[in-house]
Every structure is written in structure tokens, then in C-alpha cells.
Amino acid sequence: MGFTVVYLSLIVLIPLAALFLRAAGIGWSDFWDMIKDPRVLASFKLTFSTSFYAALTNAVFGFIVAWVLSRYTFPGRRFIDAVVDLPFALPTAASGITLSILYGKQGWIGALLPFRVTYTQLGIFVALTFIGLPFVVRAVQPAIDDIERELEEVAASLGASRWKTFWKVLFPGLLPALLTGFTMAFARAIGEYGSVIFIRGNKAVFGDEMVPYGGIIAPEIIFDKLVVSTPESLNQATAIAVTMLIVSFVLLFVINMLQLWGTRKYRETR
């Protein structure tokens, strides 16, 4: 128990405490001025909205992938199961370079598309979806494996269709695992930096229009401020990091409460 507390303190609690202590020394007025900067606000909007949509996309397609891998046997199944974990193993920079090559104007995929992916918000979305998919698949797949086949047999014997059996019997039990995967994918996307800067590049292009601040994610602003390394830039990096941390914690807390509610609701109906 003592070792656990010490380890947790060194890895998580002490760094977070140091961050909040530095933020407390900035002063509320200066803190607020740093946060309401248009460039920072735009980066928050881009970071959280794109992370949410990427996690939501992964929740849908990650669930389908997990279901297929769990319920069906087919040639190449083990290979696909291993490929799912590839974003875990790849360095984020390697992921960004790979996606940039694939989705660039001359890339295998980008050359076939009638619209641009690299240097756009869509490119950021692609990168965040890529790195978040394994979190959903690996959270949902064990839950699907643990489903009792008797539940489906009983539902079928009572005249329920396969679709109704899925939505009324199976899905409620899988929802907590799906929310867990969504939460992890969302949290991972919020802090992603390496893969995004390669596919987004040094400019943000939306249609034919150059949009100032529109393509910069919050982690990139934090990094830029740390590189400058002046007292003012370090304070702004701290303010942005603390704000992201608080907002992320609130969002994850709400999602976890929904997950807990779903689990209790499912147990009550069984």
C-alpha cells in the first residue's frame, strides 16, 4: 500500500501539484487574459471538438471491428487483430509521417480523393482517429467475448429478432465498455501532438482560405511557449495546460458517471 502511494505520488500527484502551484502564482487576472487570447480559444475549440468527433467515430467503427473480431472466424483474422494494435506501437511522429504520405496530394489515398486532407482540420481528425481506434477495440472486445450465448438463445426462443436481441439484450451490457473505450480515445486525442503536426503541417487551409489560428491545437501552443522559455511564455503554457486539465477532468468525470449509471441500470434490468 505504501509503495503504491509513493509511486502514484511521484508519477502523477506531485507533477500535477507542481503545475497547479505554478498556476496559482500567476494571478487570476493574468491567468484569464492568457486564456481568453483568440489564438488560445481557437486552439481549445479545435482540440476538444476534433477529439470528440474522432472519439465518437472510433466508438462506432471500433465497436464494429471488435464485434467482427470477436464473433467471426475468417482468413486473416489474427493479422487484422494484430494490426489494430499498430497505433500503440508506432511512435506518434512515425504515425504522422505515414498518414501524411498516404493522404498527401500524391499519396495512395490522397490522390484518389476530390478534396484535401493534409494541412486541414480533416487531417487532424484523421490523425486523432488513427491513434484512438485501439482504445475502443481493446475495451469492447473482451466484453463481447464475455457475453453469455444463453442470453441470445433465450431471447430467440421468446420470439425476439436478432436486431431486437442486440439492442435490448446485448448492447446494454456492452455500453459501459464502449463508454470506457470512448473515454480513453477522447483523453488520448486531447493530448496528441506528434502525429498531428506532421499531417497538419505549418499552415491551416480550409477550402481556399487561410484561417489564422484555426489549425493550431492546444498542445502545440504549449510546446511553442515552452520553446520560447521566457517567464511570460512559461506562465501562459501553464495556464493553457491547467485549463485543458480541468476541462478534460470534468468531461471525463461526466462520461464516467454516465458509464456508472449505465452499469447500474443494466444490472437492475437483469
Task: Mark where each language-model region is.
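Short hydrophobic faces within alpha-helices
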Residues: 44, 69, 86, 150-158, ...
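Membrane-interfacial helix termini and adjacent extracytoplasmic/periplasmic loops
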Residues: 28-36, 41, 76-77, 96-130, ...
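Periplasmic/extracellular loop-to-transmembrane helix junction in inner-membrane transport proteins
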Residues: 19-56, 68-72, 224-234
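Interhelical loop and adjacent transmembrane-helix boundary motif
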Residues: 38, 190, 196-263
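Hydrophobic alpha-helical transmembrane segments of multipass integral membrane proteins
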Residues: 10, 45, 49-61, 65, ...
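N-terminal signal-anchor/first transmembrane alpha helix
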Residues: 1-18
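Transmembrane alpha-helices
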Residues: 2-7, 56, 86, 90, ...
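Transmembrane-helix boundary motif in ABC transporter permease subunits
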Residues: 31, 53-84, 97, 101, ...
